[in-house]
């Protein structure tokens, strides 16, 4: 299972970033006349385990940087080498890996460290450092913290993972088959996976689950269960076949032993991704459902 804190290869600086819409709260005002940083996230960033620090230079100064780091009691990234020049009036996005949250207290917003103390530190070509304040304009820094603390809480109670993924023939075309495994850790009581979402290229099927039934149940006192699953081709249109940003982001709804329900992302191990995609694409071809641009 791939976690949000996994080590990932991070690409070079990008010039644009699409902020994640995470809340209906009023926008946070941006300061003027200073250097500051805004955490943002592109659509492909979650699967890469990263986010962007959007650097705003609202001064007359020029900064030639060689590295960047996001520092906060909630999480601190490694120092990442980045080469960029930021002149007055310019905004530049730099990707940094999300390291996983350092959860305070129960990991809720009530015990979350204050973002007033967060900073982005730039290392300049002369070896000096410049510290920028963080403005969580889109509440992304907060969301990453809260979601990861929720995930860590679930992981401490039960392991949830895809296992034994392999190609299988179903009605004359290849599909990916395997099992969903639940393994008890520190949690007590019954744990239920109520549902698992589809993604753009894949339709999730719980083989032995009746319509409207739960995908998997780990009864109280039982240490482990596995249920058979399949990933069928979902869409075969050009947009679906070109989907590379979040093709394996399967979102499960989990009910823990205390009765609380939580979303939980179950990524297959990255080593499975290419084979899963090749199987779904081949199924589209065999079924004659591939659509081409301009085809009516």
Positions of PLM-derived features:
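Bacterial signal peptide processing site
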Residues: 4-8
